[in-house]
Design a protein with these regions (language model features):
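Short glycine/serine/threonine-rich phosphate/pyrophosphate-binding segments
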Residues: 14-21
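A glycine-rich helix N-cap at a beta->alpha junction
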Residues: 27-44
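Glycine/aspartate-rich loop-and-adjacent alpha/beta segment that forms the canonical ThDP
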Residues: 85, 90-130
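Active-site-proximal loop->helix
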Residues: 22-23, 44-52
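Single conserved hydrophobic/aromatic residue that forms the stacking wall/gate
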Residues: 1-11
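Short, hinge-like loop/turn segments at secondary-structure boundaries
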Residues: 26, 50-54, 98-99, 121-123
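Conserved thiamine diphosphate
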Residues: 50-91
């Protein structure tokens, strides 16, 4: 039984590494909305290679295009795909009405950055904001 239905949480990680959690969410009909920011690459590694290694990209484009809406259907949950803010707003409003878990895939540019970031070996004084 889910006790605190109003709690919100944000987790940032590679979504492919957490697919197994969908099985639990579906099994227990947890009203969890997962927003997937899909840039079709290994974004954090690519960002580091852009910022610190003069765009010498290696192993950041897996050459696979996962269809997260079809994957959601395969897990037995509702999936949405958005390419702009109005689509996201519509999908999110509908997802809030669902009784079980939902995924909202947001297609973003492969060069979209996650900021702020701190370089390896750095501390808060080395923070990169743009």
């Amino acid at each position: 039984r889910l006790i605190r239905r109003q709690r919100q949480m944000c987790i940032r990680d590679s979504f492919h590494m957490n697919l197994n959690e969908a099985c639990t969410a579906v099994s227990y009909e947890l009203p969890i909305i997962t927003v997937i920011f899909n840039n079709s690459v290994l974004g954090m590694v690519r960002q580091w290679q852009t910022t610190f290694y003069e765009k010498r990209y290696s192993q950041t484009d897996p050459h696979r295009k996962t269809d997260f809406v079809k994957l959601a259907d395969g897990f037995g949950l509702k999936g949405y795909r958005c390419t702009n803010l109005p689509e996201f707003q519509t999908a999110f409003a509908d997802a809030m009405k669902q009784k079980g878990p939902t995924w909202i895939e947001c297609i973003i540019d492969k060069d979209e950055k996650v900021l702020p970031m701190i370089p390896g070996g750095g501390d808060i004084n080395d923070i990169i904001m743009e």
